[in-house]
Amino acid sequence: STALRKSIADRTAAFGEMLRQYFQTVKVVAAEDWTPEMSRAYDVTVMDGRPKAIKPAWQEKDASGKVIAYHSAVYLPESFDRPMVTIAEVGNTVGRGIGLKSDWYCLCLDADAHHWRAEHPIFKGPFPVKMTVRMCPTPSDAFHYAYFMDEPVPDSVLMWKVQNKGYQTHEGFRVGMVARPWGFEDSPDAEYISSGVCAKTLDAVAIGRHGNFLHWGFAASPADMTEEAKTVFANAIVYISRFAGQKPFVRKYNDRIATREYVKEQLYLSTREAWQERVKSDEEFAAEGLKLKKVVQEKQRR
């Protein structure tokens, strides 16, 4: 649609404008026009869209023709070793086929970061960073996942604003993505950097690295980033440039592979407490649905 094309054009222009404030040579191309070979001429590629697939999605069938497995499209060869920053769900899009840990835990990341590693290089330089932080109530959804945590979920956490807008306050705003934290750092080629306000655990990965890929889960265009976040984003680009040629060597092809945390979750879900919580949640969901139905019916009668 015309609106979608304009949105993409505006985002592309905003990224180009912001990056030129920090870097000498910047080339902007549409994701569908990009090829892996193009990245060899640049220190870092920032991927904010879906590139052309090098292998389409396909279904695996048994001898009788029954579908036994679904395989996602592949967008990069496993040999790709150039530094790349992926924005929001793009980390899952380009990463699933090559076993990246930036998988789709939840498309629910909003505008603020928390539980960041303050000592990490992206918060230090080379561009000077100022971080305005404030204590805020813990995201309510985190309490639903308290059984994952070794310590009680705190009532409040330090927050840092990454975006001036978010989907919770601005209807229709693009939503960010967090990756699963479990096993994220079980190999030296991956590191957790920050979490963010989302509907999952307090350690869900909003910013993280796996090999030569850096997942920036926040979805905002630079036009809606805070000035502080723009600087950290630029530092993230510099940081990932260090990992040229360093492909992931521990890959995760099954995003739902069982981990110790999975066992912990199954144990909790078998308790009466979990059942009561689910009943309450279902009742609240049903009540909200009836409320929305009533609103729609009233509009239809007008």
Segment roles from a protein language model:
Residues 32, 88, 126, 196, ...:
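Residues at the C-termini of beta-strands that transition into short coil/loop
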Residues 175-177, 185-302:
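Extracellular ligand-binding/catalytic regions of CAZymes and related secreted enzymes
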Residues 8, 12, 115, 119, ...:
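A structural signal for well-ordered alpha-helical scaffolds and beta->alpha junctions
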Residues 86-188:
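An acidic, glycine-rich "communication" segment
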Residues 2-96, 275-280:
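Helical hinge/lid and interdomain linker segments adjacent to catalytic or ligand-binding clefts
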Residues 37-40, 77-80, 115-116, 185-186, ...:
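Extracellular/periplasmic catalytic domains that process cell-envelope and extracellular macromolecules
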